[in-house]
Amino acid sequence: MTSVSLGMPSAPPPVLAPRRKTRQIKVGSVGVGSDSPISVQSMTTTPTTDINATLQQIAELTASGCDIVRVACPSADDAEALPIIARKSQIPVIADIHFQPKYVFAAIEAGCAAVRVNPGNIRKFDDQVKEIARAAKDHGTSIRIGVNAGSLEPGILKKYGKATPEALVESAVWEASLFEEHGFHDFKISVKHNDPVIMVAAYEMLAEKGDWPLHLGVTEAGPAFQGTIKSATAFGALLSRGIGDTIRVSLSAPPVEEIKVGNQILQSLNLRPRKLEIVSCPSCGRAQVDVYTLAEQVTAGLEGMEIPLRVAVMGCVVNGPGEAREADLGVASGNGKGQIFVKGEVIKTVPESEIVETLIEEAMRIAEEMGEADGEDAVKGSPVVSVS
């Protein structure tokens, strides 16, 4: 069989816009800002007081590609759990603080990499910024000023009537000015809303007002399907213009699903190296094979692989050969058989019953070759299915 060169392209893939230039901060070992890759975050759903369960969920998130994790801290018992969690977590931990400013100081003392503060609901927050800034600077802790449409300050709500983009931005800029007034600059900002249109407008406005790193998020985005659409729409609009330095996809779903979606959004925009991608046609009356089943079986068979490989599963002769040729590995099916392509070359034709097995075997062979070339284990993670 002909040897075919595979792997990442020699030139970097194109992006829609250069990153907006921002100041650089650190969240533990992870850089956040225009000089660093865009990071993906999630938040644990376990009670923070259940240290073992929380650390287990953090381990699962880490394995799925999470860069930074946030944990809730609504009580003194939660604050007491933070030192162990921060010390044992494989990735930087952010403590999420509302209402009680004393927990901000507890989280900083506990060794959390960062603290998220909500100026809209922490009592007398503005009066304590000086002390928070000093403590954070002394411990090397960064801050996220997390403005949320659901918890704006009463004065701002009275001024604007509701959570408009202008209201969100005014709250964020005011709090940023207080930290900067006290010589503290290691913070990022979020201005979250559950409406992607308002959220996008707020971030665009905020991006014009300073060089702060921005944490993107659509708050209360909803169940998995709806939340994925909202987040992909909003993040795509902003990231394609260079706005955004770290993201959190909020879903009413297991946190690992948030990481899968976030990583896929970044990969789709060429903002993170592409990994295994399965391209499959949506099927139609021309299809001569069960494309749905083929795609599902190939996906299941390749679960656990994490390599820059595009696999095309096509069901007819219209787009099938072309898509299969464009992919690293693919099949164009019809008349009870499938033509197997590797980098545009037909390497064999197999009966329909052997398509899945053949694709998996070829993918494994390619993965092994790529792993040997890179000196790495290419079999880890899980593939992402994109239906075209």
UniProtKB/Swiss-Prot annotation:
Molecular function via GO: 4 iron, 4 sulfur cluster binding; 4-hydroxy-3-methylbut-2-en-1-yl diphosphate synthase activity (ferredoxin); 4-hydroxy-3-methylbut-2-enyl-diphosphate synthase activity (flavodoxin); iron ion binding
Cofactor note: Binds 1 [4Fe-4S] cluster.
Top-level lineage group: Bacteria
The protein's Enzyme Commission number: 1.17.7.3
Assigned keywords, A-Z: 4Fe-4S, Iron, Iron-sulfur, Isoprene biosynthesis, Metal-binding, Oxidoreductase
SUPFAM superfamilies to which the protein is assigned, alphabetical: Dihydropteroate synthetase-like, Nitrite and sulphite reductase 4Fe-4S domain-like
Cofactors, names only: [4Fe-4S] cluster
Enzyme class, first EC level, given as a word: oxidoreductase
Gene Ontology biological process: isopentenyl diphosphate biosynthetic process, methylerythritol 4-phosphate pathway; terpenoid biosynthetic process
Reactions listed under catalytic activity: (2E)-4-hydroxy-3-methylbut-2-enyl diphosphate + oxidized [flavodoxin] + H2O + 2 H(+) = 2-C-methyl-D-erythritol 2,4-cyclic diphosphate + reduced [flavodoxin]
Entry-linked InterPro entries: Dihydropteroate_synth-like_sf, IspG_bac, IspG_bac-typ, NO2/SO3_Rdtase_4Fe4S_sf
Pfam families, per database record: GcpE
Binding site for [4Fe-4S] cluster: C281, C284, C316, E323
Pathway given in the UniProt record: Isoprenoid biosynthesis; isopentenyl diphosphate biosynthesis via DXP pathway; isopentenyl diphosphate from 1-deoxy-D-xylulose 5-phosphate: step 5/6
Family that this chain belongs to: Belongs to the IspG family.
Task performed by this protein: Converts 2C-methyl-D-erythritol 2,4-cyclodiphosphate (ME-2,4cPP) into 1-hydroxy-2-methyl-2-(E)-butenyl 4-diphosphate.
Name this protein carries in UniProt: 4-hydroxy-3-methylbut-2-en-1-yl diphosphate synthase (flavodoxin)
Species of origin: Arthrobacter sp. (strain FB24)
